[in-house]
């Protein structure tokens, strides 16, 4: 209460510090003036700080000290409050009195602040109540103090201190304080009632006396009399109570203990309460004593008395009813309290259940989305457009929207069952849903683009249903109205920036529109409308429209600028249904490419955000002219989209994607391994209920489509290596195909010569150097005068095409076989075509650049090393020196050289075939149709044909072999004759069989080559595969025959592979037919 005390006194002062601060009286005077203003008129100001610094107070002035303390003690004494002496503030003084005085000031101040109602009594220390003696005025306060007057009753200083110490242990409760206040009120009420009744009696007695006026003096005199009488009653009652207490103390049993005394006092109070409570309550409530009421009742008539009695009875009944009603109300309150507690517990249980239900519902939603991802089902979200400001009072066709994705449409134009239709989708958004809530449900799907998935989100619905509002938003300047397009790009930027330390992303944007079945680029600044082409499955990075501008973006500001340009360039027009109707399909494509920093893997994702133009009825939209043409194209493209959806829902083998540009753009999203989501928008107006129901039916068909689990476009390092290998193999294959085309033209010329030279069998040719059919001038003659022939199958160019793979030609021209140079030092022999029914010679073609065409010296039995690219002669009558030299060669060395060359030719060919087969599988080779399979089967020779050929071949071979081998039977033993005879017989059969098959295939293939080729697949692949299979089977049979004969003649053959028969001076060399293992064709050598 005093600012000086707050500054000088510490927070928790000691007793000496407290006494020292109050010694000058300045703080006490200031506090008293705040408690009772004007109590101390003159306060002597003096510095406080020096007084506190010195404990003996040497800095204080004696005059100031005594003047402030004297004024404070005098004012407190006048207020009849507790006081103390000046010596109590000195060292060794009693600080209890000082504290009691200050607490008494505090209690008095709080009583005044509360309004000063009733009599204030200090309950903290001893209270000495004193009354004035005879003739004195009553006290102003209910608190006695140490008074120096003669009329007051005071206690000694020692007695006061004794009682102070005694009452320090007494603590009155709040209930006793409340009872004391009630007693004071009751006494005041009794005093007022006593005084007023006395005044009433006086005025009534002096009513007829005029000499007794009514003035202030009369009232003062009357009140003084009342006070005296009331004081006398109180004094008398105090004397009675004192005598009763003294009587209790002076009992026969001796001194009572404190507990016994308190028990006796309590019993007395209870007895007095029981005696006077009833009368006192009646007196207080009814307004006076019963005697006074009885006296007044005499003045009323009997009717009034009876009425008062009835009223009294009614009042009693009302009281009883009130008591009963109050008890009932209390009982009902208790019941209601119990019911309220039960409801509270039930609500809490419901809250727990509801929270667990929502938790389970959220888990079910997440699991459902995972199942949908695994199935690849198109997710369908339905959004109901809110009414416009002027349409708020219109009837809505949406009857109910459920939390589980159900929506009920009420058709007012139908009755009973047909009036209500239920549709179920993944989720349904009502009219009050914000743009942010729409995007939250689509956010997980959009974010999967950064993981390498392809995502497509498109909006479908009739015109004016809010598709553009959902996808783009009405205003790009207001964040609350941003559509899915901008929110998706902003979210992708935020997420890509958060993953910078793991993956680096590059984001590009394309924006096109399909207007009147023409694809146009919206991100152009010059307003040009260049026509763009759609290329499905041509680009691995999702660029279906590669000619459109792909603009890289790095922040949201770039996206806003691009979207403004796109919306500005988009075709928009006004119709009767919508003032700003989109007249084209808009496609915003976001291309994302990321690279993992740890593994180096490439992630490619593509996000298509499609805003479809709304379907409309021409009679409602009132479209004419250009608007009519736009509406027709829009409806046609949406109809094509419906056909595609129906085909996908029915799992049809053919899906008509190419019926519209729109379906071509959405082909990868609807039919590929992508995550697809569709927003279906409906108009709640009654006049649009038909379009609403048809739109929801279309959405239900879309929801039933299962595209299969989406796959991430993640390219690891191994995949990139394999792709590089595939590209290199493709380039090598293209190079070999070009070489194959060059070889095909040469094969056609060789086929013509082969057909012209099928007249004479090689066994019947004259054994001279210049036969009729040999055409020796076409090939150079060797130095030793010998001439060689080559047996060659007569097949068509197309048949020969599959037998000359490009890889084989490259290997023949490459210097990878150095052993061939040592084995081919002799002049190259000429080759001859051989057939079973007719024979002819073919002009040989010399290729000096090829290593295989080097000249080879003639031996009686040529080695099994075919020379593919040249024709030369083989000597029929070798010289004796040559025969003698070849006879002395080591046969085992020739056999080893033959095996080396055969293996060197065979294994690269198998490797090439494996490579071509693997490439064919990786590229997803052409699948043969049934017609092509039947044609391939027809080309294979039947078993009956083989039987006929075997018969003819065996007869011819027997005749020829007997004529040729008969000359040798006289020169050699039977053993050699049997071996050679069996070898020629077996080889003759194989060669004849192979030649006839080749001739038959040639004629068949020549007639059917044009008719069997289709536009959709290459004409040569299936045919070559069939010819190769038949040739391989035949080659296998010939190799079996040759291997059987080769085991019996290994010991008798010279090094060059010629079977030499010698008797006497005559040397005769027998021809040997062998198949080359270097190509698919059956080629044999005839010496």
From Swiss-Prot:
Q: Does the keyword Translocase apply?
A: no
Question: What is a single Pfam family found in this protein's UniProt entry?
Answer: CH
- Please report what switches on or represses expression of this protein: Down-regulated by salicylic acid (SA).
Biased composition, class Basic and acidic residues, residue ranges:
1042-1054
Q: Which residues form the Calponin-homology (CH) domain?
A: 1-110
Q: What tissues is it present in?
A: Expressed in roots, leaves, stems and flowers (at protein level).
InterPro entries in alphabetical order? CH_dom, CH_dom_sf, Kinesin-like_fam, Kinesin_motor_dom, Kinesin_motor_dom_sf, P-loop_NTPase
Q: Kindly list the GO CC terms recorded for this protein.
A: microtubule; mitochondrion
Note the coiled coil stretches, chain numbering.
710-749
Top-level division of the source organism's lineage: Eukaryota
Gene Ontology biological process? aerobic respiration; microtubule-based movement; seed germination
Q: Which GO terms describe its molecular function?
A: ATP binding; microtubule binding; microtubule motor activity
* Domain Kinesin motor span(s) in chain numbering: 377-705
Q: State its location(s).
A: Cytoplasm, Cytoskeleton; Mitochondrion
Q: Where is the composition biased (Basic residues)?
A: 1076-1087
Task: Name the positions where ATP binds.
Answer: 461-468
Task: Give residue spans, biased composition: Polar residues.
Answer: 744-754, 780-797, 836-856, 1017-1033
Main localization, broad class = cytoplasm
Q: Which intervals of the chain are annotated as region Disordered?
A: 136-155, 740-858, 923-949, 1004-1087
Which keywords describe this protein according to UniProt? ATP-binding, Coiled coil, Cytoplasm, Cytoskeleton, Microtubule, Mitochondrion, Motor protein, Nucleotide-binding
Sum up the protein's function in the record's words: Required for keeping the ATP levels stable and balancing the aerobic respiration pathways during seed germination at low temperature.
Q: How does it assemble?
A: Interacts (via C-terminus) with VDAC3.
Q: Which family does it belong to?
A: Belongs to the TRAFAC class myosin-kinesin ATPase superfamily. Kinesin family. KIN-14 subfamily.
Q: What is this protein called?
A: Kinesin-like protein KIN-14F
- The organism is Arabidopsis thaliana (Mouse-ear cress)
């Amino acid at each position: 209460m005093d600012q000086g005390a707050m500054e000088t006194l510490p927070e928790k002062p000691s007793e000496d510090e407290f006494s020292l601060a109050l010694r000058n009286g300045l703080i006490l005077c200031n506090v008293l003036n705040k408690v009772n203003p004007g109590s101390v008129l003159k306060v002597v100001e003096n510095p406080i700080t020096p007084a506190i610094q010195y404990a003996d107070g040497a800095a204080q002035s004696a005059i100031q000290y005594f003047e402030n303390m004297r004024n404070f003690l005098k004012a407190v004494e006048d207020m009849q409050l507790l006081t103390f002496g000046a010596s109590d503030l000195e060292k060794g003084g009693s600080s209890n009195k000082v504290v009691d005085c200050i607490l008494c000031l505090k209690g008095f101040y709080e009583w005044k602040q509360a309004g000063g109602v009733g009599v204030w009594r200090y309950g903290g220390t001893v209270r000495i109540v004193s009354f004035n003696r005879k003739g004195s005025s009553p006290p102003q306060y209910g608190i006695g103090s140490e008074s120096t007057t003669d009329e007051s009753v005071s206690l000694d200083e020692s007695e006061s201190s004794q009682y102070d110490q005694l009452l320090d242990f007494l603590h009155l409760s709040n209930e006793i304080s409340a009872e004391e206040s009630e007693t004071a009120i009751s006494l005041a009420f009794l005093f007022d009632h006593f005084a007023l009744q006395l005044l009433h009696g006086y005025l009534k007695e002096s009513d007829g006396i005029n000499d007794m006026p009514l003035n202030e003096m009369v009232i003062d005199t009357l009140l003084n009399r009342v006070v005296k009488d009331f004081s006398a009653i109180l004094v008398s009652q105090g004397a009675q109570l004192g005598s009763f207490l003294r009587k209790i103390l002076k009992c026969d049993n001796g001194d009572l203990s404190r507990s016994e005394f308190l028990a006796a006092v309590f019993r007395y109070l209870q007895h007095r309460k029981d005696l006077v409570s009833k009368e006192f309550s009646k007196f207080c409530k009814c307004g006076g004593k019963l005697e006074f009421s009885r006296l007044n009742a005499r003045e009323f008539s009997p009717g009034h008395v009876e009425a008062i009695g009835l009223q009294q009875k009614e009042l009693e009944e009302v009281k009883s009813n009130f008591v009963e009603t109050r008890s009932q109300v209390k009982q009902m309150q208790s019941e209601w309290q119990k019911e309220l507690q039960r409801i509270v517990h039930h609500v809490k249980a419901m809250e727990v259940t509801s929270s667990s239900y929502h938790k389970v519902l959220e888990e079910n939603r997440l699991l459902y989305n995972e199942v949908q991802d695994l199935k690849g089902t198109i997710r369908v979200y339905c959004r109901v457009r809110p009414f416009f400001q002027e349409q708020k009072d219109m009837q809505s066709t949406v009857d109910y929207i459920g939390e589980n994705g159900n929506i009920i449409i009420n058709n007012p134009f139908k009755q009973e069952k047909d009036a209500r239709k239920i549709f179920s989708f993944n989720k349904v958004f009502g009219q009050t849903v914000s743009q942010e809530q729409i995007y939250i449900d689509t956010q997980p799907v959009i974010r999967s683009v950064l993981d390498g998935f392809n995502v497509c989100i498109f909006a479908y619905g009739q015109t004016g249903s809010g598709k553009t509002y959902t996808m783009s938003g009405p205003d790009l300047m207001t964040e609350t109205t941003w559509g899915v397009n901008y929110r998706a790009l902003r979210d992708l930027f935020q997420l890509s920036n958060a993953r910078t330390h793991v993956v680096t992303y590059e984001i590009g944007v394309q924006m096109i529109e399909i207007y009147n079945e023409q694809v146009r680029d919206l991100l152009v600044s010059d307003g040009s409308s260049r026509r763009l082409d759609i290329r499905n499955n041509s680009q691995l990075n999702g660029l279906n429209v590669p000619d459109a501008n792909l603009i890289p973006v790095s922040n949201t500001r770039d996206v806003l600028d691009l979207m403004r340009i796109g919306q500005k360039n988009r075709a928009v027009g006004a119709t009767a249904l919508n003032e700003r109707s989109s007249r084209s399909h808009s496609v915003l494509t976001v291309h994302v490419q990321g690279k993992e920093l740890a593994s180096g893997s490439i992630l490619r994702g593509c996000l298509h955000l499609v805003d479809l133009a709304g379907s409309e009825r021409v009679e409602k939209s009132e479209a004419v002219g250009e608007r009519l043409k736009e509406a027709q194209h829009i409806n046609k493209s949406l109809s094509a989209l419906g056909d595609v959806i129906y085909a996908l829902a029915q799992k049809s083998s053919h899906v008509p994607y190419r019926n519209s540009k729109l379906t071509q753009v959405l082909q990868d999203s609807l039919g590929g391994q992508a995550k697809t989501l569709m927003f279906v928008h409906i108009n709640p107006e009654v006049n649009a209920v038909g379009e609403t129901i048809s739109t929801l039916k279309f959405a239900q068909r879309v929801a039933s489509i299962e595209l299969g689990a989406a796959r991430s476009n993640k390219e690891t390092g191994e995949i990139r290596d394999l792709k590089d290998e595939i590209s290199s193999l493709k380039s090598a294959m293209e190079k070999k195909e070009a070489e194959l085309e060059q070889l095909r033209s040469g094969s056609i010329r060789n086929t013509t010569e082969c057909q012209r030279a099928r007249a004479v069998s090689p066994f019947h040719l004259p054994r001279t150097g210049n036969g009729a059919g040999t055409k020796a001038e076409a090939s150079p003659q060797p130095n030793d005068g010998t001439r060689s022939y080559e047996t060659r199958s007569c097949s068509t160019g197309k048949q020969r095409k599959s037998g000359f793979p490009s890889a084989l030609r490259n290997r023949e021209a490459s210097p990878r076989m150095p052993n061939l140079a040592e084995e081919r030092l002799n002049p190259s022999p000429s080759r001859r075509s051989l057939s079973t029914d007719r024979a002819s010679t073919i002009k040989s073609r010399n290729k000096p650049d090829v290593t295989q065409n080097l000249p080879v010296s003639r031996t009686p039995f040529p080695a099994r090393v075919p020379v593919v690219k040249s024709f030369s002669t083989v000597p029929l009558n070798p010289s004796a020196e040559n025969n003698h030299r070849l006879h002395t060669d080591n046969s085992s060395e020739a056999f080893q050289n033959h095996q080396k060359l055969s293996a060197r030719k065979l294994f690269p060919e198998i490797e090439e075939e494996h490579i071509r087969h693997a490439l064919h599988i990786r590229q997803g080779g052409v699948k043969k149709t049934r017609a092509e399979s039947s044609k391939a089967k027809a080309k294979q020779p039947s078993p009956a044909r083989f039987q006929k050929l075997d018969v003819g071949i065996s007869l011819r071979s027997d005749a020829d072999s007997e004529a040729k081998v008969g000359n040798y039977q006289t020169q050699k033993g039977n053993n050699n004759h049997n071996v050679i005879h069996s070898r020629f017989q077996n080889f003759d059969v194989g060669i004849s069989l192979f030649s006839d098959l080749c001739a038959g295939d040639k004629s068949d293939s020549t007639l059917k080559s044009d008719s069997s080729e289709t536009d959709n697949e290459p004409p040569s692949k299936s045919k070559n595969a069939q010819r190769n299979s038949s040739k391989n089977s035949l080659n296998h049979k010939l190799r079996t025959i040759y291997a059987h004969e080769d085991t019996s003649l290994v010991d008798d053959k010279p090094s060059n592979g010629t079977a030499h028969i010698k008797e006497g001076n005559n040397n005769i060399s027998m021809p040997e037919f062998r198949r080359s293992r270097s190509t698919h064709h059956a080629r044999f050598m005839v010496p």
